[in-house]
A protein has these predicted regions:
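Non-catalytic positions within long, well-ordered alpha-helices that form the structural scaffold/packing
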Residues: 38, 134, 191-192
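An N-terminally biased module of ancient metal coordination in phosphate/nucleic-acid-related enzymes
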Residues: 1-79
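Extended substrate/RNA-proximal surfaces in nucleic-acid metabolism proteins
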Residues: 57-169
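Active-site beta-loop-alpha junctions enriched in small/polar residues
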Residues: 15-17, 50-51, 86-90, 118-120, ...
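Mid-to-C-terminal alpha-helical segments outside catalytic/metal-binding sites
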Residues: 213, 217-241
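Short acidic/histidine-rich active-site segments
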Residues: 195-211
């Protein structure tokens, strides 16, 4: 069933769980980020602390305990905000094995996995990661695709989607900000062509990297139409559960 804006936004990329990465550092900061998310009309968040397979152990127990703490606080505050577990995986050769062994979580216990790379990642490594993840039965979502320089070459985003069914996530702040001529043209093109599947906040705090989902929705609505705004902020993200 089609979602409407009244159902609320779904944010699949959010660093609100304190003490696990470079996002929220304290319980008070988590509370502030939850409040900001609610003010932005978000009704479901997938918590995505950084995971670095083979480089450091993932704090699964702490993640689940602090998600439970955040859920209880939201109930006490009367906030209708669902919080689900996940992570943002820095792709390494150990990623598939650690996913299979349950050492790092998928998004909301689904087959979707949020994966990031260095901005200078070669295109062949993106293809290799996509191939390995899909062969193992996962649905890769490449996080903040605007950062990867190799994807600025014509046709490369399309080929990844065609060959491996990779989903693409763009940060809300990227959609809201103005860019240089060629960067703006690329951002507009990948959205207009339907290559971007998710808009997400990648929020780390309430100041320099704050949640801007409502502003992102308005920007998409004004520049690309209501259908695109709903698809990126509501409909597609709601399928991950």
């Amino acid at each position: 069933m089609k979602k409407s804006p009244t159902d609320g936004f779904v944010d699949i990329h959010h660093h609100l769980i304190y003490g696990l990465d470079d996002g929220a550092q304290t319980w008070e900061q988590t509370q502030q980020m939850l409040t900001r998310a609610g003010e932005n009309g978000i009704r479901r968040i997938i918590a995505t602390p950084h995971a670095e397979p083979g480089m450091r152990p993932f704090p699964m127990r702490e993640l689940m305990e602090r998600i439970r703490q955040a859920r209880e606080w939201c109930i006490q505050q009367g906030m209708q905000l669902e919080i689900l577990p996940g992570c943002e995986i820095f792709y390494t050769p150990q990623t598939v094995r650690m996913l299979r062994d349950g050492l790092i979580p998928t998004l909301a216990e689904s087959e979707f996995v949020l994966v990031e790379f260095l901005p200078t990642v070669p295109y062949r490594e993106l293809r290799s990661a996509a191939k390995a993840l899909t062969a193992a039965g996962y649905m890769p979502i490449f996080a903040h695709i605007e950062r990867y320089r190799c994807l600025r070459w014509p046709g490369r985003v399309r080929k990844l989607k065609r060959d491996f069914s990779v989903c693409m996530q763009m940060n809300a702040d990227t959609i809201c900000r103005k860019h240089s001529f060629f960067s703006q043209r690329w951002v507009n093109a990948v959205i207009q062509k339907g290559y971007v599947d998710f808009a997400a906040t990648d929020s780390h705090n309430v100041t320099s990297r704050a949640c801007r989902m409502r502003a992102c929705y308005r920007e998409l609505q004004q520049r690309f139409g209501e259908q695109t705004a709903e698809r990126l902020c509501i409909v597609n993200p709601a399928e991950i559960q």
